[in-house]
Amino acid sequence: MAHVCSVILVRRSFDIHHEQQKISLHNESILLLDKNLADDFAFCSLDTRRLDIEELTVCHYLQNIRQLPRNLGLHSKDRLLINQSPPIQLVTAIFDSFNDPRVNSPILSKMLYLSCLSMFSHKKELIPLLFNSISTVSGKVERLISFDIAKRWYLRDIAERMYTSESLIKKKLQDENTCFSKILLASRMSMARRLLELRQIPLHTIAEKCGYSSTSYFINTFRQYYGVTPHQFSQHSPGTFS
């Protein structure tokens, strides 16, 4: 999967020009840029180190955000964030780890990438930047729903948050061979599966967390989607059903 953004570690101070402004980058600061901007700058390898982050990692980061930010529209133009004083020893260790052949665990790599993104979590522009880096409309819709699975979602809610029209979203989703109702159902069923695998949450609570006011309707929907009831699913090891 292609990368959608990059984290840059500055190794010596220098200036860049962005949107008709000069920006002074200090030694040991880090930047987060969208893919196109990172490619446009073509930083010198003597001045910087670069870590490219894939879209799946961005989606995993956003999936753990449970509070829907207000500034989350396509109107946001932020493409560059700077952390002038990150925990440099940790940052350096993370960058070094990707050159260490002993670090070959996909799970560990994922956690290191997420750690890099979290170093910009104090920036209110982080979520819009990551959200806008998602390449598909269906991916954006899925991420919006994931912020609050229990919400009674309508297409107009998505259009409002993406600062566009319902008809345009419908058309783009059709171009991607999907639709809003399919994405909503898949998101709810994915959440239901994860909660059932915990085996510690009452069924009516799982139904509510997945946006269903009726437990019986949730059970029927789950059975139609996975081919088994929630009870049958919870009796098997995680990953048995697809």
Curated annotation (Swiss-Prot):
InterPro entries: Homeodomain-like_sf (IPR009057), HTH_AraC (IPR018060), HTH_AraC-typ_CS (IPR018062), Tscrpt_reg_AraC-type_HTH (IPR020449). Residues 139-236 form the HTH araC/xylS-type domain. GO terms for cellular component: cytosol. Coiled coil: none annotated. Keywords: Activator, DNA-binding, Repressor, Transcription, Transcription regulation. The keyword Transcription applies. The keyword rRNA-binding does not apply. Depending on the conditions (growth phase and medium), acts as a positive or negative regulator of gadA and gadBC. Repression occurs directly or via the repression of the expression of gadX. Activation occurs directly by the binding of GadW to the gadA and gadBC promoters. Homodimer. This is HTH-type transcriptional regulator GadW. It comes from Escherichia coli O6:H1 (strain CFT073 / ATCC 700928 / UPEC).
